[in-house]
Amino acid sequence: MDFIILLIAILALSSTPITIISGSVTNHTYSTTNSYTNVALSARKVVFPPPRQLGKDNSDDDDLICKTCKRLSEHRTCCFNYFCVDLFTNRFNCGSCGLVCIVGTRCCGGICVDIKKDNGNCGKCNNVCSPGQNCSFGLCVSA
């Protein structure tokens, strides 16, 4: 019990943000809840909505982010939950804002493809199987 009281006292005096790994991120200024807790994440970086500052109207910042996103490339990027995402590679915004690839597919060039079967994206995006080969379980094998 003394250890818990000591830990709470140290955390209360600390100015370092505290991260709680349970689907939520919490610190002294920001608070948000991860709405994608049921999604299996790969080792690739996944774009999530940024934390929102409590008690502050962020509309000016949000507008700036979306305008900057459109300036980068109106046809390749999208402002999704106030975050600029790449429509050619983002699984949650593949080809257009909000179009989510189903489990087992990957966003390659703005199209959701099954990299285990697709001859033009075998095992990874843009990995084309040679003529006479088929994509089987993500590997190019002789037909």
Swiss-Prot record:
GO terms for cellular component: apoplast. This is Protein STIG1. Interacts with PRK1 and PRK2 (via extracellular domain). Residues 1-23 form the signal peptide. It is found in: Secreted, Extracellular space, Apoplast. The keyword rRNA-binding does not apply. Promotes pollen tube growth. A C-terminal peptide is cleaved from the propeptide in the stigmatic exudate and represent the major form of STIG1. Binds phosphoinositol lipids. The binding of external phosphatidylinositol 3-phosphate (PI(3)P) and PRK2 by STIG1 induces a rapid intracellular reactive oxygen species elevation. Residues 76-87 are annotated as: Sufficient for PI(4)P binding. InterPro entries: Stig-like. Pfam families: Stig1.
